Amino acid sequence: MLVAWSRRSARRSEVRLPFADRAEAGRELGARLEPLELDRPIVLALPRGGVPVGLEVARRLGTADQPVPLEVLVTRKIGYPPQPELGVGAIAEGGEPVLDQGLLDRLGLSADDLAETVRDERTELARRVAAYRGDRPLPALRDRAVVVVDDGLATGGTARAALRAVRRQRPSRLVLAVPVAAVQAMHALSGGPPDGADDLVVVTAPSTFRAVGYWYRDFGQLTDANVVTLLAQATASP
């Protein structure tokens, strides 16, 4: 089932799953965003996987006369030091670490215990910003409709950090858009400030989520070079 969902509306119809790839998912997602009639939109894709999705969203929302810009908003997961695959928080450029306090309490950790990990992730975040944008700053977001895009929403930790960072820049409207989302994460991020989006748009929210990659036939890993190429394609789009 397809779900195009926001705090204000819900819609359901048929969609074929899994998606062929991130580009197809982005086209589906862009079609669900069009009815929002966003004012001066800009698409911020979370690299790496969100970039091919975001490219198709920007193309769908823009026109030859009024293209919609695509930029990256770089984020990094903050992992549990003994088991880095377990995310205990995240950080986005322009923002502060956003930690899962409940999980930290269960693990017996404090923010101080993560200081070295956070420092390492800040370093990697800065490296990726330089790789993707060089010395160009993130465009001004104040009084614009900002669409934050990723290829899926599992726990929501990275998206929460991204939304908080964007909210600090006072956009007129903040939209989170993903092709597939876990229901629990979707509802956690749909409540507006400080952690949620003004609108949340998803293509499908399966009752049994499994993992983001399960919903794609082609879910290949992307490189920094892939991201740079996709951003160049967005700039070259008519």
Regions found by a protein language model. Give the residues of each.
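PRPP-associated nucleotide enzymes
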Residues: M1-P238
